[in-house]
Amino acid sequence: MNDYEEFLRNKKFKFFNVGKDIDQSDCNPLLFDFQKDIVKWAVNKGRCAIFLDTGLGKTFIQLEWARLIGGTCLIIAPLSVARQTIKEAEKIDLELKLVHDESQLKQGINITNYELIDNFNGNVDSIVLDESSILKSISGKIKRKLIDTFANVKYKLCCTATPAPNDYIEIGNHAHFLGVCTHQEMLSMFFINANKEHTIDFNGKLYIKKGSNKGGQEWRIKHHAEDKFFEWMSSWAMFMMKPSDLGYSDDGFELPPLNIIPIVKEINGYHQDDVLFFDGLSGISDRVKVS
């Protein structure tokens, strides 16, 4: 290997596992096998993101991750989700403590909500961000607080069902929080500040159409870096839409077809002519009168 090849190798992002090796049998037997596989992968990574579609059991996965990582764990969730997570934990025989500040933390799994993060200083062994798409804002106060407060926490897990696949800001902020790289490092490595491009199929031929650059604020992935970008993402993030993505059966996870049944409601006392859409109801009081 010559010096230049060595130079290029050293430029490559390296993300090392900092977690623990476990066996699938260490996971709670109530979990599905695909969930156990994800838990095993995440515990081994130590710092990672789990982007699973709705209904695939992110809550059970994050709870098992916290249990197997050990020590003092803090789960941060939206206000409406915290107590729901406590109830879900009871289904797999785990006890969660709802805490409001750092003085209430105990050994084991603790949970709080995002509105209370000013009461914590990051003195935990592991941190879980539930609904981690809250990191999306590039300059948001909560995003900055989360990154700064928990920068030195060894074990980190992000969970959300809705990462924007074409939103470099959200992807970069997840990588920044997890300690993979900063948002700017990701942009400089894989993206270029240029007009976004869209592929259009016209009469069987593919064309590339350039879009707006919005005053220099738009970034697009470098064409030659696409494979490396997704290879890099797979080193710290797990994406899954259904169990078959990991080779398992989708039985029990396939939704029935959606049937849309229109219901026409006659509105007494309200008539409008020469309009396409009826807009004669003004406020709640009018809507209450509709019979």
What are these regions (language model features)?
Residues 8-51:
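Conserved pre-motif I regulatory segment
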Residues 45-65, 160:
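Walker A/P-loop
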Residues 93-118:
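Inter-Walker segment of RecA-like/P-loop motor cores
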Residues 120-122, 132-146, 167-168:
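Conserved ATPase-coupling elements of RecA-like P-loop NTPase cores
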